[in-house]
């Protein structure tokens, strides 16, 4: 919400189970060899489960194991002196940063390399807003479309379409349109007297200027590349910076945004 500082509070509830003491009869049971055998079998089953190799696990078991392993990972902020204990998460990385001060309130593996996928488009939008104008024209070249594969996020834009930068950013952020993100980068780069690669260079330089040290961006839409990576801390710094742009906040407040067919030609 513009003009207001937003604070997200995580409330941890601790529930105590209390058993009240009430009068009851005392019952003694004879030792049960069957029960002992069942207990031994259960213990053996538990040991077997623990020793089960990953290659023998089903996809569901592998997913569950990955979640459990992630949950057990260290939360760095829990070791800070006089700092509240944060909750566990099933994600391998997590961060909470105060957008006003940049203070980190919660940290879990925040410098670990991760593939950013479509959140790359947040940085793409930041560079577009920094170097472009919302009224600029964005023309879709063959390069903006040719890499698209079936199933890729798209707004259905075609080669030769011409829309405004504002419309292209709506498509990039609301529809996560990969062709729109590419077109934004290509056109903003050209309007600055350069090209798409210059735009990617600005993405990396901007990240470093904000204090990012563990990122490398090679495209504007986040489609997978082994050399395209970031970390939670760097993305939080990028998010904090773009929070200063009211145009970005306006776009993010919308649930849908129509682009008239007449505007694409």
Which residues make up each language-model segment?
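Active-site-adjacent loops and short helices of periplasmic peptidoglycan-processing enzymes
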Residues: 30-35, 41, 45-233, 237, ...
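A general structural signal for well-ordered secondary-structure junctions
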Residues: 17, 134-135, 178, 213, ...
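Sec-dependent N-terminal signal peptides
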Residues: 4-16
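Sec-dependent signal peptide cleavage junction
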Residues: 19-35
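Extracytoplasmic
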Residues: 234, 239-265
């Amino acid at each position: 919400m513009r003009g207001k500082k937003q604070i997200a509070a995580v409330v941890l509830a601790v529930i105590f189970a209390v058993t009240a003491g009430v009068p009851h009869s005392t019952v003694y049971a004879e030792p049960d060899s069957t029960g002992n055998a069942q207990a031994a079998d259960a213990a053996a089953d538990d040991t077997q489960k623990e020793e089960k190799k990953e290659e023998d696990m089903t996809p569901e078991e592998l997913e569950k194991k990955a979640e459990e392993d992630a949950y057990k990972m260290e939360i760095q902020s829990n070791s800070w002196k006089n700092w509240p204990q944060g909750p566990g998460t099933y994600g391998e990385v997590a961060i909470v940063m105060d957008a006003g001060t940049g203070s980190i309130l919660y940290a879990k593996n925040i410098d670990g390399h991760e593939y950013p996928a479509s959140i790359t488009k947040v940085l793409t939008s930041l560079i577009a807003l920094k170097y472009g104008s919302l009224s600029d024209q964005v023309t879709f070249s063959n390069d903006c479309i040719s890499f698209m594969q079936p199933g890729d996020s798209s707004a259905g834009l075609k080669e030769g379409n011409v829309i405004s930068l504002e419309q292209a950013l709506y498509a990039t952020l609301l529809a996560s349109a990969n062709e729109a993100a590419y077109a934004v980068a290509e056109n903003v780069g050209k309007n600055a007297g350069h090209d798409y690669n210059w735009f990617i260079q600005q993405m990396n330089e901007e990240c470093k200027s904000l204090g990012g040290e563990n990122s490398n961006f090679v495209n504007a839409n986040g489609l997978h590349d082994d050399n395209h990576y970031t970390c939670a801390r760097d993305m939080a710094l990028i998010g904090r910076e773009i929070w200063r742009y009211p145009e970005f906040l306006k776009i993010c407040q919308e649930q849908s945004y129509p682009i008239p067919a007449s505007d694409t030609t």
